Amino acid sequence: MNTEIVQKHRVLTKGNPNVTFIKVSIGKRNFLAYIDTGATLCFGKRKISNNWEILKQPKEIIIADKSKHYIREAISNVFLKIENKEFLIPIIYLHDSGLDLIIGNNFLKLYQPFIQRLETIELRWKNLNNPKESQMISTKILTKNEVLKLSFEKIHICLEKYLFFKTIEEQLEEVCSEHPLDETKNKNGLLIEIRLKDPLQEINVTNRIPYTIRDVQEFKEECEDLLKKGLIRESQSPHSAPAFYVENHNEIKRGKRRMVINYKKMNEATIGDSYKLPRKDFILEKIKGSLWFSSLDAKSGYYQLRLHENTKPLTAFSCPPQKHYEWNVLSFGLKQAPSIYQRFMDQSLKGLEHICLAYIDDILIFTKGSKEQHVNDVRIVLQRIKEKGIIISKKKSKLIQQEIEYLGLKIQGNGEIDLSPHTQEKILQFPDELEDRKQIQRFLGCINYIANEGFFKNLALERKHLQKKISVKNPWKWDTIDTKMVQSIKGKIQSLPKLYNASIQDFLIVETDASQHSWSGCLRALPKGKQKIGLDEFGIPTADLCTGSSSASSDNSPAEIDKCHSASKQDTHVASKIKKLENELLLCKYVSGTFTDTETRYPIAELEVLAGVKVLEKWRIDLLQTRFLLRTDSKYFAGFCRYNIKTDYRNGRLIRWQLRLQAYQPYVELIKSENNPFADTLTREWSKPSSS
């Protein structure tokens, strides 16, 4: 029996004729409160509130069995409803007696006279806003059977939920195995074919790798294991690629080196597969507004796809001691492997795109509704996985989460996005003094990954300094300035902002800026902003607001364009609404970049326009489907957005830029430079200010 029911049962049967339970509510939750006239204080379980505070000094209490207890947490000024009338409890102490809430004399004396009758109790209710207003309130005392019935109903509901969720665990177990070719579960039936461009060509790369005794022993053990599992077989293929071991940070962390096969020559000789992997921004767009997540990881995903007999010889590899093997399954290192596996997963999950997606072997299930709805979605996906014969790793599966790590990001149900600790760790493990050009490339690759997700505020100019060192035309030299640059970047990695993945109900604000050498942008969102401002789901005003119009002019000079910056009534309406709600705006992402040598020769006014074009196109997946507010401190750019450039060969690039901008429908707000700190600091932190 549940401990809570046991405790209530003891209270009800200990022989006390004055045992009194009543129904009360705190916030939106209902509880059974035990009226204890022998208690001097009020006590409650942790579940009655989320606002417990630690006491400065522990409070000693003595309970009915004369034992001492120390209370360390309490909540103050709790509003409690009895018969829909609000009462104030000055303080409730945290103590788990097995009962949800114990109401003691400190409360009863506040609302005396307290009268207990055979079937009811009465208290004097006082209006908290007008203490002179009061009345006697009567509420029913619950009988022993009623209390136990309510308690058992609660346990029954909990049991139903437990059994409901338990079926998910059982369903997951049905598709899990430690062997990717488990014949009882892997029934996909596919045979993968890879073809040579020239069917008669032999790709035999001489293996000149010097192996250590450790290498020989590990190859022997690993290949015997792969043979036993049926993943490889001994080969007589004319083709061969050398195998070797790598031991990077991840391998050191897990305590096992990773075997790698150099298929470079084979990849050059075979026909590729152009099936695309989903973009990260597409994935984030798809899961917008989701509250619940589950992630499933295919067990050694590539190894679940069997190779056609004609393809197996192409995967042959050599390793010590004088061994020649070929794969029975899809191997890592083949250029076609990611596309082949992505196609397999997309086809397997076809029709379920509204609740799940796959990035190679990582499956993400997402739900915008309730927890129960998400559980149902998980069951549907698991059933499909079983039908398609996909094997899942139980160890890596995470079910029914409101926060989940996926593709290097930590995604939360409230729309918040953070960089996963694992991704941060990979960057911080680089030394402050990078050893060579290859290490700089790897370092910048990791940094670019973070920048592409929108976390890094001013990467463009910091990155440019290190990028120059990659070129072999420049003599290799590393000095203290370079070290400080790396340290600066690593320092910023440790204090990156949290980002917000805006949903369709949110209103977006884009801020752009440019200097002579770089451009930048900042995307922010007003949660549920379209409703707050008075816009429909596409960002169009629901009320009749006059719209501005733009027409072609014979004069395309900056002065003429400046005249056109006067905002339409719609622009003014939206901008004024946003200004009042400025404190509610959430950061979505940053972007920055540098202009080419040719572009740096453009007039600064035109660079402001080009910066806007680059920023909007970078975030096209967010901005094409809705209207948004575009903020700029350039009069020229503000006018450019409302002004039709006259077709003229002298204005070629301006016309091209305007054609690119026609895909977007922004509300335009001209702001002062000091009011554009987000984008402005990105371009000017490392360059001299330029007036526009």
UniProtKB/Swiss-Prot annotation:
Keywords: Aspartyl protease, Endonuclease, Hydrolase, Nuclease, Nucleotidyltransferase, Protease, RNA-directed DNA polymerase, Transferase. Its EC number is 3.4.23.-, 2.7.7.49. PROSITE patterns: RT_POL (PS50878). PANTHER family: POL PROTEIN, RIBONUCLEASE H. This is Enzymatic polyprotein. The lineage of its organism: Viruses, Riboviria, Pararnavirae, Artverviricota, Revtraviricetes. Encodes for at least two polypeptides: protease (PR) and reverse transcriptase (RT). The protease processes the polyprotein in cis. Reverse transcriptase is multifunctional enzyme that converts the viral RNA genome into dsDNA in viral cytoplasmic capsids. This enzyme displays a DNA polymerase activity that can copy either DNA or RNA templates, and a ribonuclease H (RNase H) activity that cleaves the RNA strand of RNA-DNA heteroduplexes in a partially processive 3'- to 5'-endonucleasic mode. Residues 227-411 form the Reverse transcriptase domain. GO terms for biological process: proteolysis. InterPro entries: DNA/RNA_pol_sf (IPR043502), Pept_A3A (IPR000588), Peptidase_aspartic_dom_sf (IPR021109), Rev_trsase/Diguanyl_cyclase (IPR043128), RT_dom (IPR000477), RT_RNaseH (IPR041373), Viral_Replic_Matur_Polypro (IPR051320). The active site is at D36. GO terms for molecular function: aspartic-type endopeptidase activity; endonuclease activity; RNA-directed DNA polymerase activity. It catalyses: DNA(n) + a 2'-deoxyribonucleoside 5'-triphosphate = DNA(n+1) + diphosphate.
